[in-house]
UniProtKB/Swiss-Prot annotation:
Name used for this protein in its record: 3-hydroxyacyl-[acyl-carrier-protein] dehydratase FabZ
Similarity-based family: Belongs to the thioester dehydratase family. FabZ subfamily.
Pfam families with a match to the protein in the record: FabA (PF07977)
Source organism (scientific name): Proteus mirabilis (strain HI4320)
CDD domains cross-referenced by the UniProt entry: FabZ (cd01288)
NCBIfam families: fabZ, PRK00006.1
InterPro entries according to UniProt: FabA_FabZ, FabZ, HotDog_dom_sf
Length: 150
């Protein structure tokens, strides 16, 4: 893994519109344009949603695991096709086959692995997996669409 295939938080902030508390990718470990991306989300007990999900038994919300994978696909899309034109956005279009295999807890490091499957008429399909300690926490196929802002 070479330095030119990693991204630090400053570079991620330049690519994604998300900000705290909704930025769910801390670092990109490796990627190959048009192929795959591997990133990390460090799960801290200080995340604001742990106050209510669930009191006394904090669990990272499954929908946010999916969102973290979607953000990783966004980074891969940006690195593969370049920045969007003014007035364009990537919209999260669909999710298929989402499966949750284990809980993600405070202190876990979630590794996000996304793979480009295909693109047709501005709609891209990706396969995503979130792992903790090498064990699958969540997997799904996702689609995003490149469109003009509405």
């Amino acid at each position: 893994m070479s330095d030119n295939h990693t991204l630090q938080i400053e570079e991620i902030l330049d690519l994604l519109p998300h900000r705290y508390p909704f930025l769910l990718v801390d670092r990109v470990l490796d990627f190959e344009e048009g192929k795959f991306l591997r990133a990390v989300k460090n799960v801290s007990f200080n995340e604001p949603f742990f106050q209510g999900h669930f009191p006394g038994k904090p669990i990272f919300p499954g929908v946010l695991i999916l969102e973290a994978m979607a953000q990783a696909t966004g980074i891969l899309a940006f690195k593969s096709v370049g920045k969007l034109e003014p007035g364009e956005l990537y919209y999260f279009a669909a999710i298929d086959g989402a499966r949750f295999k284990r809980p993600v807890l405070p202190g876990d490091q979630m590794v996000l692995e996304v793979e480009f499957i295909k693109e047709r008429r501005g709609v891209a399909r990706f396969k995503g997996v979130a792992k903790v300690d090498g064990e699958i926490a969540c997997e799904a196929e996702m689609m995003c669409a490149r469109r003009r802002e509405v």
